[in-house]
Structures are given as structure tokens and as C-alpha cells.
Amino acid sequence: MVKDSEFLTLVFQSILDEIDVGLHVVDEHGNTIVYNNKMMQIEDMEKHDVLNKNLMDVFMFSKQQDSTLVQALQEGKTIKNVKQSYFNNKGQEITTINHTYPIVQDGKIRGAVEIAKDVTKLERLIRENMNKKGSTTYTFDSILGTSPAIQDVIENAKRATRTSSSVLLAGETGTGKELFAQSIHNGSDRSGGPFISQNCAALPDSLVESILFGTKKGAFTGAVDQPGLFEQAHGGTLLLDEINSLNLSLQAKLLRALQERKIRRIGSTKDTPIDVRIIATMNEDPIDAIAGERMRKDLYYRLSVVTLIIPPLRERKEDILLLASEFIQKNNHLFQMNVEHISDDVKQFFLSYDWPGNIRELEHMIEGAMNFMTDEQTITASHLPYQYRMKIKPADIPEPETPRHQPAADLKEKMESFEKYVIENVLRKHGHNISKAAQELGISRQSLQYRLKKFSHSSNE
């Protein structure tokens, strides 16, 4: 019987920890007796921080009555669909929608159970989007590049400013899609209106409708009238980044809003007309996304009235050094430095590298290099982050000559001779500074000192 009881307890605990809602149970004194894994995730807490401790000692509410668990204990009433905001012991704000029930035994309240759904992210995203309303900084003058590949896209994007047609921007990660989106907005008649940007990949499916279309007071207890992105962008532009990350059913609802030019808030029966220009971005070929069922064909046709394909950096090599120079000047201002040049071997690397992260990768590489510099004025291979430094071949290193009358040395001797030549050149370059030379060579100080001792021993033999 004891074993059966232990087994049932184990089953019960396993179920509690696997369900996808938060569960918090307190006894009649407000001490936590059950706290499942989902609740830990929602509140960013550990079980040992909450279990067997009083609710009001662990969490902070603006007033005690704001705790639905406390209300259930005090009033003995079931509380359904109530929004609650409070703080955990780290000072992080938590927002949940709760169903809370008193536990009654023999007419006496013995505790309370709370079932919670997390809406913290929803609240934060709404605030962020309201704060970002109208915040654009880029124009077409911000887009650098003289290559025909980028100039063609710029010219077509400028033409797109004359209308309010939907625009689809396709390009790899880091190619500058939002820069183009802001430039189109700022060059259009809508420039005086809001510009709202949302990365669709950052939205959980359960929150997308609330974020896009808004909520009406009464949709759930504690809900307020909250405009969605479409209403916030009314009269302006709505940028939907990585739209292919939305699931197909949500894409269908988005398509309906675009076709009908009206939306309906969650919990409302009233349609609201909208006047919004949509700019959508994708980080893959639209045809591939349709074939892979990541993009609805009808939504693609609706969005792709104007389609701009932004070229990757590897297809606009002539712009690389121009962009690098711009990023150097930007960081000179930020870091109070005076970097002016890039060494020839680094330039050659920039021009031959594939740039999978495109312009963003180049910008981060320059910033990383300048973090390794002190008073130098030239970015060299030694300043680049390690993962790039190893890919650069030393420039202008001649092969050590072997006199014709001497027999060719064996492979080991040739390798040692070449290694010595490279190390001596790097040491001279850095004024025999062991640390800097080791950094450029990609080896430790101890390893470099070992090699120098080995060369010294060989020359004395």
C-alpha cells in the first residue's frame, strides 16, 4: 500500500511538471506547497526559493489584494481569467492571466490553487512597440555602396516610395533589409506617420494575434483596450520582419486583414478600418519558402507587389572596403580612437572572404578588431577576432631560398626554416613584443618562447 501511494505521488508530480500551465498551491497560511516546472519558467524562479515559503515573502505585489491566491484564501471565492502583475525576488516584472480556486475541507478554507498563463512577453512587446512608434533613423543616403548590384536595388526602392503598395524585401541575414525599409518609409508620403517594426520570429504563436490586432477590454478579466500593430501603424508603415517564420494559419489571418483593410481586436465584434503600408522581409528565396510550405502562395502574391532582392556582400566586393572604412570611422567616434588604415593582408582577406553574415558580420569584425587596439592606426591580422585571424595568410613572405648547389633539405628542415622565418618577421613587426607576436601568430606566449629557445639552441649547435 505504501508503495502504491509513493507511485501515485510520483505520477502526480510528473503530471504537474509536464503540463503547459503554471501551477502554484499554497496552504491556509499562504505557504507554498506545490510549485510546478512551468511556474518556475514563468516566474524565473527555482523551486527551493519558493517551496515552503510564504507567498508574500517571495513575491512583491503593489498591495496584498493584488495576489489572487491571497484573495482566494481570504474570500473563499473562485477567481477566473484575471490579469495579475507582480515582481519576483530579482525585481523582474511578471504578468499572468490566472484562474484561482480556494481549497475547502469541512467548510474551512485549507489553501488555494492558482493556474497561470504567462503574458509577460506580450505586455513587454506591446510596450516596446509603443516606444518605437515613429522611430526611424535611416534614409537612402545611409545605404553605402557604388557597386551596380546595390545601386540597382536603391533605384528601384526609390521608385517604390511614390506609392503605398506592399513591398517584399528578400535577402540573407545582415544584408540591410530594415535599412531599406526605413528608407522607403522616410522617402514616401507616409514619412510623417508612424513606422512600426516587428520581428515575427520573436513572437510565440499564442501571442501573434494579440500583438498584430490588439485586445478589447473584457476579452479576459484585467484586459484593457490595447491597440495592435496595425492600429499603431495607422497612417504609416508596418514592417513585418521574417514573415516566413509565422505559421500558415496565422499567415491566412494576416492575408485577410490585408485584403479587407480592416482588423478586429481579440474579444471585439467590431471591425476597425486600417490605412497601413506593409513592408515584409524574408531571409530566404520566396519561391523556396513557398515550396517548403513556410509561406502561403496567396500571401506572397499579396505582399510582392514590389519585390526587392538585396544582394549579399560577396556579390558586391567593390563595396567591402568602403563599408569597412565607414565602420572604422563610426567606431573611432565611439571609442575615441584614430584608426586610419587596414593592412594589405587584411584587405586581401576581406575581398576573398565569403561573408555569410554579410554587412553585419563586417561591422562586428571591425568593432572587434578595434577593441584589441590601443594607439595603433592600422588594423592588422593580429587585431582580428581569433576565428578570422587563423584564415589570413601572411602577406609578402618569400619562400626561403635553397642554393642550387646544395641538396634540398628534407621536409622537416624546410618546415622549421619557414617557421623560424615567419616568427622572426612577426617579432620584428611588433618590436620583439612577445605578447603581440604570439597573438598575431595565434599561439600562446609559452609556445612562442619555447620555439625561440629551440631556434637559439639549433643555431648554437
From Swiss-Prot:
A Gene Ontology biological process term: arginine metabolic process
Traits of the deletion mutant: Cells lacking this gene do not grow in presence of arginine as sole nitrogen source.
GO cellular component, as recorded: protein-DNA complex
DNA-binding region: 434-453
TM annotation in the entry: none
Keywords per UniProt: Activator, Arginine metabolism, ATP-binding, DNA-binding, Nucleotide-binding, Phosphoprotein, Transcription, Transcription regulation, Two-component regulatory system
CDD domains per UniProt: AAA
Pfam families given in the database record: HTH_8, PAS_9, Sigma54_activat
One of the record's GO molecular function terms: ATP binding
Segments forming domain Sigma-54 factor interaction: 143-372
Modified residues (4-aspartylphosphate): D57
InterPro entries the record matches: AAA+_ATPase (IPR003593), Homeodomain-like_sf (IPR009057), HTH_Fis (IPR002197), P-loop_NTPase (IPR027417), PAS (IPR000014), PAS-like_dom_sf (IPR035965), Sigma_54_int (IPR002078), Sigma_54_int_dom_ATP-bd_1 (IPR025662)
Binding site for ATP: 171-178, 233-242
Induction text: Not induced by arginine, repressed by RocR itself.
Cited NCBIfam families: sensory_box
Role played: Positive regulator of arginine catabolism. Controls the transcription of the two operons rocABC and rocDEF and probably acts by binding to the corresponding upstream activating sequences.
Protein name: Transcriptional activator RocR
Gene: rocR
